[in-house]
Amino acid sequence: MNPQLARRPAATLLALSCALSPSFAAAKDLGEDDFLSRSRRLTYEGRRSGEGYFSADGRYMVFQSERRADNPFYQIYLMDFETGETSEVSLGTGKTTCAFLRPGSNEILFSSTHHDPESLRWQQEELDFRASGKERRYSWDYDPEMDVYAVDRETGEQKRLTNARGYDAEAGYSPDGEWIVFSSMRDAYERELSAEEQKTLEVDPAYFGEIYIMKADGTEQKRLTSVPGYDGGPFFFPDGERIIWRRFSENGLTADVWSMKTDGTDQRQLTDFGSMSWAPYVHPSGEYIFFASNKLGFSNFEVFIVDVAGTKEPVQVTYTDGFDGLPVPTPDGKQLVWTSSRHKGEGGQLYIANWNHERALEALAEAPPRQDN
């Protein structure tokens, strides 16, 4: 998904900016240095980069970046931490997003529209718009042509895993590599919508996003959620027993972190933060969850952690104005990669820092009980 706030109607955004309150206050004795050390920028090339995810051994990181001269949209890249080399994984055509490395395999998962015969036209239209000098707020369009693919990084062989009208993306493998969880908006295209639903689809297609699960070969696709509002950004817990994701409220004003069993049962709300809380990812220890939230200001996203049961108030991790989000720990839990605009550039870039796991546990133990909003 995009490394910024998901697109919302203007009226909703205005209401959200009014709804956010400064009631949350980070502990006075905590700061970014408590959790992060030796922060450094990983990506420099391109207009923007984000969403970095690791191979099981930590050697590779897959991410998305806008860096091709002939395509203004995200493409997928693989960074090798041993050699320092970065290579393009996707095909260079269309839009791509949300890559993930399959454990025990050379396969890389991502979503793409390269099969769309209109892809080159959309690319040229966007290139022409940017060349005109005009500007617009960055947004994500939830392209209904987006489908999930798996590509072998050695042979280049690709497999199309979904083929449904509607945005299929935000996919990740289970720890054993046998299952894939993803978000889909196919429901809006598979049935006849009411007049009100059709209007919603035209304004905010993300409203129809739901969580699905399937086998790694694309078979046995099953819907797990059926709640009005955008459900997306799912990942498996380290033990593979549960799924973490974020759920937007029906009116799109807020989002919170949830977890459930892999069959869709036992759905639990883990945050009640009264803001946009999204992009959750579980620490390898299984003891707490990283996520991003704009609790401190409409356009100021920071990284937070919350205990895995959601019994405590979240603890703030980053303290830098702008965008800090999409946090993902390395497989050994000793480092954290996230997307940030702290360099004051045009778009987000990837950063990495050493992670203080012990201090995180201490801070969560000291956090007050969760308050309902």
Regions found by a protein language model. Give the residues of each.
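Multi-bladed beta-propeller domains
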Residues: 27-47, 79-95, 151-166, 214-230, ...
